[in-house]
C-alpha cells in the first residue's frame, strides 16, 4: 500500500497527514460523532469517501449549515423508507432538506391522515434504531432505469440528469454529472433494506439521526407545476439534539400563536373572502385604523425628508412594460392582458417604477431639481400560484410604499447614505430595532452596464452600509441584472428574520426610458436611479408588526387606544363623556356599554389587547377621576380626567409600548 498525503483544514488551521491508500474521510476523525461528512476540493462527500493524494479535507459538523442539511436529507430518506414499508403502493417523488426541516412527496391513492403520520414516525424510530448504513454507488442511466422501473417520477428525474433545478428540489437527486443511488443496508448482514436515487451526501448510519418529528402533510404538485399530478407531501424536522428539537417545537408553538392570519381573525382586522379569491385581503375597520396610522406616519416622515407624492393608475398599455422590459423578464408574474380599445393589450401593473419614469420624463429636468424623490403608496398586482400565497406576506394584490430617487452621479453616495439612514430610523419608529444589512452584488452571467460602473456602485453601497455600524453580510451574485442593492434584514420579537427594506441602484431603466436632465454646462446627462421600498408592502409590513407585537400594538398603532369599563350601568354616561373629550384630541377611545359584568368586560378587552382600560365607579365620578388598568393587570387609581387623557396622548406621541 502506498502513502497518501492529505491536509485537514479546520478554519485557518492546516494539518498534513500521511495515510495509506484506501483510507476514508471518516477515518481521519475517529470517535468524533459530530462530524457527519467532509468537504473535499470544495465538494461535500460521505465519510466513506476514499482519500486521494494531495486532497484537502474539511470536516463537516452536524450543527453547521451543511451538516444540518445532510441530517435532514438523511431523515427524509428514512421517512420515505418508512412510508414504503407501511404503504407499499406509494410512489416516490422528491425529498430535499429545507429551512429547519425536510419534506418528501409521495403519490398515494388517499391523503395521509394524522394517524398515518403517527404510524410513519413510529416506523422511522424503528429504522433509526436499526442503524442502517447509507451506502453510495454510481450507476449508469440504463441501470438506474432498470432498478427504478416501478418509480415513474424517478424515471423522469433520470431524464433531466445534470440540468435539474434547485427550485423544485430535483437537484438533490440528479443535480450532478453522474447518477448515484443510496442503499440503506442492514448493519449486520449487509442486505439491502431500501434504496433511492440521490446525489447525497448522507450520514454514515441512521443512528446519527438523534431527534426528529413529523409536522404535517399537504397536497403539492409534482415539481411545483400545476400541469403535473397532485402528490402528498409530508413535512418533518430534525435536529442534532433532543433539546434543540424541543426548543424548535416551542418556537413553532409561539410562532403559531403569533400567526398574523390567526390574529387577524381573532382581533377582527382583515379577512380573505372566498368570493374575492386567494391572496386578496379586505381590511376591516380595526385593521383599517392600524393601516391608516401606519401610512399617515410614513407619509408625514417622507414629507419631512423631501419626498414628493405622486399617484399612478392600476393598469396601463402593454407597450409601457415592453419598454421597461417587464414583459421580457417578469411576464410569468403578471396577470394576463385585457384587450381594450380595439384589441390593445392592457395590464395590471406589477411595479410602479415605469410610471414614475414617465413622471420624471413629462418635462425637461434641470440639475437644480435633483435629487428628485418621488413617492407613492402604489397598489400592484402579481400573479402568485395559490400554493405559495400566504396571508398578507405573500399576496396577489398589495400596496407598496414605493420611492424612486433621481440624482446626479455626484449626489449618489450622499443620497444612498441619506436614504439608508432614513429607512433604518423609520423602521425603528415602528418598534423594530435588531437589524443587519445584506449587500447583493453582480451575477457575472446576467447584468447590464459596464464592469467599471458596477464596481464603483457596489463599493459606494458597501461604504454606505458600513457607515451604519451594522453587520454587513455579502450576497455574491444576488443582485438583479440592473444593479446592486442593500437589503435591510430585521429580527422580530421571537428571533425570526424578515427582509424589510431595499435600496437598489438601477442602470437599466434610465437607459430604456432615455431619461435625461440638463447639466450645469447645458449638456444632456443621464440621472442615477435608486429604487427604494421601505415596508416592502403595507400588507406585509402590517403582518410583520402584528406578529412582532403578537397583536398587542403600541398605543399609537392600536385600533382602540383605551376602553371605558363602567363598574355599573350608572357610570356609563360619565365614561362616554370621557371618551368624547378624548376623541376631540384625536384619541381612539370607546366605552363598553354591554350587559356583561365588569370582570367579563375586562377579560374581553384583554383578549382585544387594548393598551388602557379606563375604569370608573361612584368615587371616581364624585372626584372627576378615573382608574387606569394596564395590559399587565396593574392599576392606578384616582387619576383626574384631564390628566388621564393627557397620559394617553403622551403615550401616543412618544410611540411607547405599554
From Swiss-Prot:
Keywords: Aminoacyl-tRNA synthetase, ATP-binding, Cytoplasm, Ligase, Metal-binding, Nucleotide-binding, Protein biosynthesis, RNA-binding, tRNA-binding, Zinc. It catalyses: tRNA(Thr) + L-threonine + ATP = L-threonyl-tRNA(Thr) + AMP + diphosphate + H(+). It comes from the Bacteria. It is found in: Cytoplasm. Belongs to the class-II aminoacyl-tRNA synthetase family. Zn(2+) binds at residues 353, 404, 531. SUPFAM superfamilies: Class II aaRS ABD-related, Class II aaRS and biotin synthetases, ThrRS/AlaRS common domain. It comes from Streptomyces griseus subsp. griseus (strain JCM 4626 / CBS 651.72 / NBRC 13350 / KCC S-0626 / ISP 5235). GO terms for molecular function: ATP binding; metal ion binding; threonine-tRNA ligase activity; tRNA binding. GO terms for biological process: threonyl-tRNA aminoacylation. One of its GO terms (cellular component) is cytoplasm. This is Threonine--tRNA ligase. It is an enzyme of class 6 (ligase). Homodimer. Catalyzes the attachment of threonine to tRNA(Thr) in a two-step reaction: L-threonine is first activated by ATP to form Thr-AMP and then transferred to the acceptor end of tRNA(Thr). Also edits incorrectly charged L-seryl-tRNA(Thr). The keyword Chloroplast does not apply. Its cofactor is Zn(2+). Transmembrane segments: none annotated. The keyword Transmembrane does not apply. Residues 259-554 are annotated as: Catalytic.
Amino acid at each position: 500500500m502506498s502513502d497518501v498525503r492529505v491536509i485537514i483544514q479546520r478554519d485557518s488551521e492546516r494539518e498534513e497527514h500521511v495515510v495509506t491508500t484506501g483510507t476514508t474521510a471518516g477515518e481521519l476523525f475517529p470517535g468524533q460523532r459530530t462530524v457527519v461528512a467532509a468537504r473535499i476540493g470544495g465538494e461535500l462527500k460521505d465519510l466513506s469517501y476514499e482519500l486521494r493524494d494531495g486532497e484537502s479535507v474539511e470536516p463537516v459538523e452536524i450543527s453547521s449549515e451543511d451538516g444540518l442539511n445532510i441530517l435532514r436529507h438523511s431523515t427524509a430518506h428514512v421517512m420515505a423508507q418508512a412510508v414504503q414499508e407501511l404503504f407499499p403502493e406509494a410512489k416516490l417523488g422528491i425529498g430535499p432538506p429545507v429551512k429547519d426541516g425536510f419534506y418528501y412527496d409521495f403519490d398515494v391513492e388517499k391523503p395521509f391522515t394524522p394517524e398515518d403520520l403517527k404510524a410513519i414516525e413510529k416506523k422511522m424510530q424503528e429504522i433509526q434504531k436499526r442503524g442502517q448504513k447509507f451506502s453510495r454507488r454510481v450507476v449508469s442511466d440504463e441501470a438506474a432505469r432498470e432498478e427504478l422501473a416501478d418509480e415513474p417520477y424517478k424515471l423522469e428525474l433520470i431524464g433531466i440528469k445534470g440540468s435539474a433545478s434547485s427550485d423544485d428540489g430535483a437537484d438533490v437527486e440528479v443535480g450532478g454529472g453522474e447518477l448515484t443511488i443510496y442503499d440503506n443496508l442492514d448493519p449486520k448482514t449487509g442486505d439491502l433494506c431500501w434504496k433511492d436515487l440521490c446525489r447525497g451526501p448522507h450520514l454514515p448510519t441512521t443512528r446519527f439521526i438523534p431527534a426528529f418529528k413529523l409536522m404535517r402533510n399537504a397536497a403539492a404538485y409534482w415539481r411545483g407545476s400545476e400541469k403535473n399530478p397532485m402528490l402528498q407531501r409530508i413535512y418533518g424536522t430534525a435536529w442534532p439534539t433532543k433539546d434543540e428539537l424541543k426548543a424548535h417545537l416551542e418556537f413553532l408553538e409561539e410562532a403559531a400563536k403569533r400567526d398574523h392570519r390567526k390574529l387577524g381573525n381573532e382581533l377582527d382586522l382583515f379577512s380573505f373572502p372566498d368570493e374575492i379569491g386567494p391572496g386578496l385581503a379586505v381590511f376591516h375597520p380595526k385593521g383599517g385604523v392600524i393601516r391608516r396610522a401606519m401610512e399617515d406616519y410614513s407619509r408625514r416622515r417622507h414629507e419631512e425628508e423631501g419626498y414628493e407624492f405622486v399617484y399612478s393608475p392600476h393598469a396601463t398599455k402593454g407597450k409601457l412594460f415592453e419598454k421597461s422590459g417587464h414583459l421580457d423578464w417578469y411576464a410569468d408574474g403578471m396577470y394576463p392582458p385585457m384587450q381594450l380599445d380595439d384589441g390593445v393589450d392592457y395590464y395590471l401593473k406589477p411595479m410602479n417604477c415605469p410610471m414614475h419614469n414617465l413622471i420624471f420624463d413629462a418635462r425637461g429636468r434641470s440639475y437644480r431639481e435633483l435629487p428628485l424623490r418621488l413617492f407613492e403608496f402604489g397598489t400592484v398586482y402579481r400573479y402568485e400560484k395559490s400554493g405559495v400565497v400566504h396571508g398578507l406576506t405573500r399576496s396577489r394584490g398589495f400596496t407598496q410604499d414605493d420611492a424612486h430617487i433621481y440624482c446626479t452621479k455626484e449626489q449618489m453616495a450622499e443620497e444612498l447614505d441619506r436614504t439608508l439612514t432614513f429607512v433604518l430610523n423609520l423602521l425603528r419608529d415602528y418598534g423594530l430595532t435588531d437589524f443587519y444589512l445584506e449587500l447583493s452584488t453582480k451575477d457575472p452571467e446576467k447584468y447590464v452596464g459596464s464592469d467599471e460602473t458596477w464596481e464603483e456602485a457596489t463599493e459606494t453601497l458597501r461604504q454606505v452600509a458600513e457607515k451604519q455600524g451594522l453587520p454587513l453580510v455579502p450576497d455574491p451574485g444576488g443582485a438583479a441584472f440592473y444593479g446592486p442593492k442593500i437589503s435591510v434584514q430585521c429580527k422580530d420579537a421571537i428571533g425570526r428574520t424578515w427582509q424589510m427594506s431595499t435600496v437598489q441602484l438601477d442602470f437599466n431603466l434610465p437607459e430604456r426610458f432615455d431619461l435625461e436632465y440638463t447639466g450645469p454646462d447645458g449638456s444632456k446627462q443621464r440621472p442615477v436611479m435608486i429604487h427604494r421600498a421601505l415596508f416592502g408592502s403595507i400588507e406585509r409590513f402590517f403582518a410583520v408588526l402584528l406578529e412582532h407585537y403578537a397583536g398587542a400594538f403600541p398605543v399609537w398603532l392600536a385600533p382602540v387606544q383605551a376602553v371605558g369599563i363602567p363598574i355599573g350601568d350608572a357610570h356609563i354616561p360619565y365614561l362616554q363623556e370621557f371618551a368624547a373629550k378624548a376623541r376631540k384630541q384625536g384619541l381612539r377611545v370607546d366605552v363598553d356599554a354591554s350587559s356583561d359584568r365588569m370582570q367579563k368586560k375586562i377579560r374581553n378587552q384583554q383578549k382585544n389587547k387594548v393598551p388602557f382600560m379606563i375604569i370608573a365607579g361612584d368615587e371616581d365620578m364624585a372626584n372627576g377621576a378615573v382608574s387606569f388598568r394596564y395590559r399587565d393587570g396593574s392599576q392606578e387609581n384616582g387619576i383626574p380626567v384631564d390628566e388621564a387623557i393627557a397620559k394617553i396622548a403622551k403615550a401616543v406621541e412618544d410611540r411607547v409600548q405599554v
